[in-house]
Swiss-Prot record:
The chain crosses the membrane at residues 59-81. Keywords: Coiled coil, Membrane, Transmembrane, Transmembrane helix. It is found in: Membrane. It holds the Pfam family DUF4547. This is Single-pass membrane and coiled-coil domain-containing protein 1. Signal peptide: none annotated. Residues 193-214 are annotated as: Disordered. It comes from the Eukaryota. InterPro entries: DUF4547. Residues 5-40 form a coiled coil. GO terms for cellular component: membrane. It is a single-pass membrane protein.
Length: 214
């Protein structure tokens, strides 16, 4: 074997070792890219979770700090509770087979997180009312904070005390998410009242409550 042949073989072996190392490095880089992407996704998810929690905390703080008088609070509470009842009632209308297992709106909210069909129906109901999840979250927060002392006022009583509830909410509720949710509740109920005849518009709240079977 000549010196040139030996040198050529050694060079080929060296190139093969370099090629193997490059392939190994390429595999490692791909694994690092996957790890980086996973970490990025986890970071983004964590950031969104923190942002969502911060936004929810702000709504809670705003709901607790509302400067409404007792009468004003009851009027706003009346719109909120009527919208929540409407959402629950509509869900039961669309899911008659689940009436017994969905006795409250809270049960609907829990079930939709686990059941795709319930979630899709819930999304369609929100679309019907022109609501988004953040609106419902704001309304539920308001209800939790003030539900223990809130009193429902009928529509004619509300009009007698305050002519423009939306104006009052806009002026007094500074948190944008809470303000948007409350304003949307007023719009939904007022639009519904306009669509009803005078006799139906005087229906008491209990007639709006969905039937619940034992």
């Amino acid at each position: 074997m000549t010196h040139e042949t030996t040198t050529l073989i050694s060079l080929k072996e060296a190139m093969k070792r370099v090629d193997n190392k490059l392939r190994a490095l390429d595999t490692q880089f791909k694994e690092l890219d996957v790890t980086k992407d996973n970490l990025t996704l986890r970071f983004e998810h964590h950031s969104k979770t923190l942002a969502s929690q911060a936004a929810q905390d702000e709504i809670w703080t705003a709901a607790l700090a509302l400067g409404f008088t007792s009468m004003e609070l009851n009027i706003v509470y009346s719109y909120v509770i009527e919208v929540l009842i409407c959402l629950h009632t509509r869900m039961l209308q669309k899911l008659p087979d689940l009436v017994r297992s969905l006795p409250t709106l809270a049960s609907v909210l829990r079930r939709k997180a686990k059941n795709k069909h319930v979630r899709l129906v819930w999304e369609s109901v929100l679309q019907e009312y022109g609501l988004q999840e953040r609106d419902v979250s704001a309304l539920c927060t308001f209800f939790i904070v003030h539900g223990n002392k809130g009193e429902h006022y009928a529509a004619n009583v509300r009009r007698m005390y305050i002519k423009d509830v939306s104006f009052m909410i806009t002026n007094m509720v500074k948190n944008q998410a809470l303000q948007d949710g409350l304003l949307r509740a007023v719009q939904i109920i007022e639009k519904g009242k306009q669509a009803q005849d005078p006799e139906n518009s005087r229906a008491p709240l209990k007639e709006l409550m969905p039937p619940v079977k034992d």
